[in-house]
């Protein structure tokens, strides 16, 4: 059995120890949860999760891998992933990369081995909560103090929305799209 190498620290002082995957980087964000059984690639690349650390309640994530065609946006902007177990060797004919490989490439940390259902209950009972995924060797008290001082962004829509109009010339019917959160990718 491997020994723990990462920790999730919540602003209320709760510390969860787990196993690292993805980028070896400390990032803070609002901890949220997703109860879907599938669609983890779409979730990690969904602009609506900008600045958030996403907890998946389904027990095994990454089993069908990642492929370029299923990204919701070109530049995912989540701050981290929390899973019970991450699949190291995905199996699907469309698999191009493992979840671990993609998170490393995108510089997003992940932590596994966490009781995600317990964490989800905490979020449901207490509401919005900040958290940070960091190496286990980092002092939890110091990380907690820094986390409490961290201001999370409040302009997420501005960060992920297009700043200019796009025109597409063509024949046939004319269509107008008003962007209230359209995904690109």
Identify the meaning behind each predicted range.
Residues 1-185:
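RNA-binding accessory domains that recognize and position tRNA/RNA substrates
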């Amino acid at each position: 059995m491997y020994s723990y190498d990462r920790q999730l620290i919540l602003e209320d002082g709760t510390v969860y120890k787990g196993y690292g995957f993805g980028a070896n980087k400390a990032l803070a964000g609002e901890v949220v949860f997703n109860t879907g059984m599938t669609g983890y690639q779409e979730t990690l690349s969904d602009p609506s999760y900008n600045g958030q650390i996403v907890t998946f309640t389904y027990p095994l994530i990454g089993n069908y891998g990642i492929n370029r065609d299923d990204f919701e946006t070109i530049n995912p902007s989540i701050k981290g992933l929390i899973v019970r177990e991450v699949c190291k060797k995905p199996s699907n004919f469309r698999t191009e990369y493992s979840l671990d490989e993609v998170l490393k490439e995108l510089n997003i940390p992940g932590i596994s081995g966490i009781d995600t259902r317990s964490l989800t209950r905490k979020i449901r009972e207490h509401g919005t909560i900040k958290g940070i995924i960091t190496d286990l060797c980092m002092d939890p008290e110091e990380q907690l103090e820094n986390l409490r001082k961290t201001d999370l962004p409040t302009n997420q829509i501005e960060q992920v929305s297009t700043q200019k109009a796009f025109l597409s010339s063509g024949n046939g019917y004319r269509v107008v799209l008003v962007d209230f959160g359209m995904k690109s990718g």
